[in-house]
Amino acid sequence: MRTLLLPLCLAVALVGCDSTDTGEPPADGAQRFRVEIANVAPAFGVLKSGTFDTPVGAAQPGPIFPGDAYEISFTAGPNVTPGSGMRFSFATMFIQSNDLFYTFPADGLALYDAQGRARTGDVTGELVLYDAGTEVNEAPGAGPNQAPRQSGPDTGTPENGVLGRIDDGQPDRAGFTYPDRADVIRVTLDHDGETAFTVRIENVSTGATLPTPDGGSVAVPLSPGGWAVHVDAVDFFASGQPASGGIEAIAEDGSPGALAGELGPLTGVTVPLSPGTAAVHTSDVRFFQGGAAASEGIEAIAEDGSPGALTAALQSVTGIREAVSFTTPEGAAAPAPIGPGGSYAFEVDAVPGDRLSFATMYIQSNDLYLSFAGEGLPLFSGQTPVSGDVSDQVRLYDAGTERDQEPGVGLDQAPRQAGPDTGAAEGGTITRVVGTDDGFSYAAPAEVVRVTVTPIGG
């Protein structure tokens, strides 16, 4: 798969650009700190992946024969970042061959149209029969090194070729011809009206589908395979290039395990971080109160990545020394979220006894945010300024203001929501998220954000 550099143009949905940081020298006796909030999460090009190996109605894994089908169910929204689109790919072996497989084109099948409507119905017309180029082709339905007749997996003469498509009615590199795709396989797509899809892969071949050199004919079984839901900037395979080990294992032997191993490390939810609010305050101020309802400012960050309300509200709170909105990524010219590798930085002043608090939205969620505990992070140990990586003090919180949906999929999450403050109200309280408290899985804070505090000057 090609490496993905995810676009993160979420500024339309995630707004807020005010700041009370004056840039003036620190007051007498105050220590200036530089604070960097960096996104250290990985960028994933694949949202979901897996294998299919058990025919519908069967109790054990196996190929599908005429009349049999596999089904694959998954959830996916229209995008994971603005401008991206979600696609589906799979691979299943044309078993009466040496190394042929059915799939969609390398960039996959679009799951949504340009208007964001889910695709449904028969999509067989978009399938392609590919030659993996890994084993020399023999007469289809008769070769001794083909899956039904070979002595074991990975037999046959290596070809050392590249992936190439075989269109209906066209011969392969060795001059052999194959049935039209619609005479062997039918693929249909169903959608539940929200985010759930079911792909059905049916074997529609018959005993007369594939003529053999002896004048007879055979059906074409289809093998277990692998699948992925991925963004449109990522290819499932590289046409014209050598096949990966995972594609080779399916195309030659109908074995999906190696492809699952290749897809696994590429699969996950990319987590951008939003503009946010930071404050320096005394020890008797709490940035938020766990177990209590979220303030409007915390809600605006947790749901929409908008820090303006919280920054403004803090101005009238006794014990707040300084409040700032961090909105513009380092190296950027305009406010925006930060994707993997991006960072925000700002400077604040503090005296011994002061604490630092901040909040930034965990964007692939409905109302989650990253922060220190409500009492904040002490900026001094006695009279000595804190210095270095303080990421181990960061927590993930649920604001309790909007019902949670599956991360990276929910239609009321930025960047998929229709606008700010959408989604069903929860009426809950702020809770720390650990593990799968809400039924969903989230990356640990240290896997997403790195917060570094650096004293400036003497």
Describe every region a protein language model picked out.
Residues M1-L8:
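Sec-dependent signal peptide recognition
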Residues A13-G16:
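C-terminal motif of bacterial Sec signal peptides marking the signal peptidase cleavage site
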Residues D18-D21:
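Bacterial signal peptide processing site
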Residues P26-T120, E194-A196, S205-G374:
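Structured domain cores in non-transmembrane regions
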Residues D99-R149, D367-R416:
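An exposed acidic His-Trp-rich patch
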Residues N137-H191, D404-G458:
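Activation corresponds to long, low-complexity, non-globular regions
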